[in-house]
Amino acid sequence: MATTPDAAFETLMNGVTSWDLPKEPIPSELLLTGESAFPVMVNDKGQVLIAASSYGQGRLVVVSHESYLLHDGLVPFLLNVVKWLCPCPGAPIAVHSSLASLVNILGDSGINALVQPEPGEALGVYCIDAYNDALTEKLIQFLKNGGGLLIGGQALNWAAHHGHDKVLSIFPGNQVTSVAGVYFTDISANRDWFKVSKEIPNLRLYVQCEDELEDDQQQLLKGMSEIYIEAGVIPSQLLVHGQRAFPLGVDNSLNCFLAAARYGRGRVVLGGNESLILNQTMLPFVLNALHWLMGNQTGRIGLASDMKVLKSMLPNSSFQWSESELLTSDLSVFCCCSLANIDSEEVEEFVAEGGGLLIGAEAWSWGRRNPYSSCMTQYPDNIVLKRFGLGITSHVAQRGSFPFPNPEGTNYHFRRALSQFESVIYSRGSSLHESWLNKLSQDCFYMFQMTHQRISIYDSVKKHALKMIQSKDFPSVTEQYPIARGSSQAFLLSLAYELFKSGVDRSQLLPPPALLPPTESPITIKISTDNDNSWVSTGLYLPEGQVAQVLLPSEATHAKLKVLIGCHRDNISQARTYFRPPVMTYVYHLTSSQTSISWLYGGLLYIMVPNKYNQDNVSVTIRGAVSAPYFRLGKTTQEEWKNLITHSKAPWGELATDNIILTIPTVNLKELQDPYPLLQLWDKMVRAVAKLAARPFPFQRAERVVLDKQISFGFLHSGYPIMGLISIVEGIISEFKIRSHGIWGVIHELGHNHQKSGWTFPPHTTEALCNLWTIYVHETVLNIPREQAHPSLNPELRRQRIKYHLNKGAPLSNWIMWTALETYLQLQEGFGWEPFIQVFADYRTLSGLPQNNEDKMNLWVKKFSEAVHKNLAPFFEAWGWPVKYAVAKSLASLPEWQENPMKRYTAEGTEGRE
């Protein structure tokens, strides 16, 4: 028996070389929404005319016109269908009287079939048209128990008499086939051209058929004008991806936090947090939701323990309640905050056969606990919710007040939006709004998580996305050819990235590569516990489009080692204009003895070593990459360096000491004939940084500085690595320029890296304290006095800042940046650098440090006063610090600071704080 969609398709199409259809009948396009459903016959417009699926233990084939089942030209295919549907050899084949002549067609081919008014108790195959509404329950149970059902029909005539928007929900055939995720629609299908596919054909992204979803939306939101998500409630964003799923509540960025769906004969309402349901302000919505979920049913509403408060919240309702953790047969609706403890097949069948499901849950906390897991396929609730066309994501929605309904937000739907973008790509439609494109990018991230299981409704999305990339070629973005955020090109970049992450081979995304540099002999890097929590440079570069192999011992496959391709870590997606791709790095987890690695943009290679790494002397071998310029102080010889910069084709290289590593464009490195004096100077500067911070030296993890064409903000920012624009390259690789002009920016960022929360008072000192390191390095290493190191430290400007601050009454709101720095400069000029080193060292030994600024500032007053053996309370009070009475009293026994520089300003008549 064929057990996978691919095997089933092969069985159904065995020996079928052409589609011979009658010309007169007008078929209905079929809509596929179920995970088990797949197309069998698709026309040149992408419309499905024949589909197959399964439900419970049984199988189903749906044909878009009943006359096709009586057409001699389809006999070879019909024989395959009966064979595939038959649960076991010799099982009975029965035909409803509406298709009586099918008995003769099958008989002529040696298959015995009988006309029967309904399926018999013995499981076999039953053939029927799609217009019978008396056998619905029997057909569903026959299918569920293991029978094979062949059904054909079209809904066009029915729609003309009963309403186009009712077809999906009420058309008799859909009452049966919908449980397996297949629908007859009110759309006529093109009959002109059919191609026999060798593999499962692709589905359209979105079928523009009429539905009741707009009416459903209105019914669910009746009486609601807005929703207020209060502080403390953090809802997850929801992915609304099924054709019959729709958003209800969205924030200002189109992030959905409340949604609903029809699935089979049942309905689902989903909130991105249980508080969106278990909240008094949401009672009107909850009442609407429960009535909508009940539909025409009369059973009880089941309440899981985490939802039983609903009963007391709705004391005057006419509902019959039942507290239950299980989906019992007497329930019409089930309410819960988690589906983790209920079998997913049970939940799917409950909804498919008419049940209603109300659930409120978030996944952002799960995402934080499982950062490398697939939210859509591994988060327990999503295992079943994704079948309903919904998903709970690990991203959070905004909080605040949002209108109900929001036309722009509730009109956005993932499949519809991607389909519209596809029309733009093929010049068949107008461009999408930037907000839709931004939302689409994020939704693709989650949608592509579901495309590893060969499920047509998911795989088809990936295939369409890949075809868009291939039709327009891979987007190139450079300084000469920038791309605007929100443009079609920007979305294609994002789409390519998400496709690559989902497993699409880079050869399907990138154009054929130019002649690649020859690969080097395998390089082996030793990883030890000394590399704990760091990136280990390999001195190798992986060109774009090239594949390398990473090998490591089997005992190291659980060590959580990773390979990082590229070091330009800033995600610049929020920039208005891109001068390079928004995401330039990619990480592979080394969980097997051999890992193939590649990346759309190539990059320098690093081994990422986790925190608390405990395996020593592990050999990691890389083959298939090329050497990059890499000079390590004390190891690389002058001759080796000259050879590297002469012959390397890698665009980036590195200059390294044990304490700092600089990533520089190769074109700039070629001008550096001897990096030794430069790196000696850098080592002296970072030694000074460590000394002031009272940190051990050499560093356990070297600081990193990476230059880039474009970074996330500013021209430099702190972090690991420190990121800076290429325009500053001369200022960091020229020993002469550093010694003569200083290097304020990078040392400023190093200062940020060494600031500690306990003695930083945001926002006042965030950009002030870090400058202590710049001044210290300039004065103690470069012999550049502070007034020359930065123009803002001109003595007269400093005096003016102090006077201005005091004339305003020394408000704390004014004590920021250069004004805040002045306080520390006065302390340094009065007592030298040693007290700072001592106090920073003391802070490293303290536990239970205060978290608010006032308490942190008072601790600093106390600590610094004790370090210099002076009562500094009056000094800090003059600056406007909120010195507490108890702290001032505890310091009163210390000698007065006679040289307090603030006295000079008060003596001049400036009003200071008492």
Swiss-Prot record:
Going by the entry's taxonomy, the superkingdom of the source organism is recorded as Eukaryota
**Found in which tissues?**
Prostate-specific. Present in both dorso-lateral and anterior prostate.
Residue stretches making up the Peptidase M60 domain: 533-832
Question: Which SUPFAM superfamilies does the protein's record reference?
Answer: Class I glutamine amidotransferase-like
Instruction: Kindly give the Pfam families that the UniProt entry links to this protein.
Output: M60-like_N, Peptidase_M60
Explain the purpose of this protein: May play a role in the regulation of the cation channel TRPM8 activity.
General remark? May act as an autoantigen in prostate autoimmunity.
Family that this chain belongs to = Belongs to the TCAF family.
Q: Which PANTHER family match?
A: EXPERIMENTAL AUTOIMMUNE PROSTATITIS ANTIGEN 2-RELATED, TRPM8 CHANNEL-ASSOCIATED FACTOR 3
What protein is this chain from? TRPM8 channel-associated factor 3
